[in-house]
Amino acid sequence: MYAIIETGGEQLRVEPGRFYDIRHFASLKSKNLSSNTKILIYRVLMIRNETTINIGQPWLKNAVIKGRILHSHLENKITVYKMNSKKKTRRKFGHRQNSARFVVDSICLDGKDL
């Protein structure tokens, strides 16, 4: 059983009991997310349960993914180097993206856990 959800500008294939990293988590700041914060994700695009497949247009009604935040963290630093040739103009800076790791507890459709 799995579901495809939309969160943080990405589409993820999620299964109960697994954890995932998301960059832009809804409208929550990564610093405000504490450990074991319960979350509900309503943007469910598709649910597959054994032989049945439910597809939303664009999202499924009455479908919810229940989970909790494990922790928020910063991803690895990327270095950006800009240079104009023959001008002696150089600029080097880095960036670390905020990210949150969450675990999927259950997939619910029409109020029932699948």
UniProtKB/Swiss-Prot annotation:
Q: Does the keyword Oxidoreductase apply?
A: no
GO molecular function per UniProt: rRNA binding; structural constituent of ribosome
The record's principal subcellular location, in a coarse class, is: plastid
Record localization: Plastid, Chloroplast
Q: Please give the subunit comment from the record.
A: Part of the 50S ribosomal subunit.
Entry-linked InterPro entries: bL21-like, bL21-like_sf, Ribosomal_bL21
Which Pfam families does UniProt cross-reference here? Ribosomal_L21p (PF00829)
Q: From the Swiss-Prot or TrEMBL record, give the protein name.
A: Large ribosomal subunit protein bL21c
Which HAMAP family does the annotation name? Ribosomal_bL21
Gene Ontology CC, one term: ribosome
The UniProt entry's sequence similarity note says: Belongs to the bacterial ribosomal protein bL21 family.
**UniProt keyword list:** Chloroplast, Plastid, Ribonucleoprotein, Ribosomal protein, RNA-binding, rRNA-binding
Q: What does this protein do?
A: This protein binds to 23S rRNA.
Q: Name one GO biological process term.
A: translation
**What SUPFAM superfamilies does the record tag this protein with?**
L21p-like
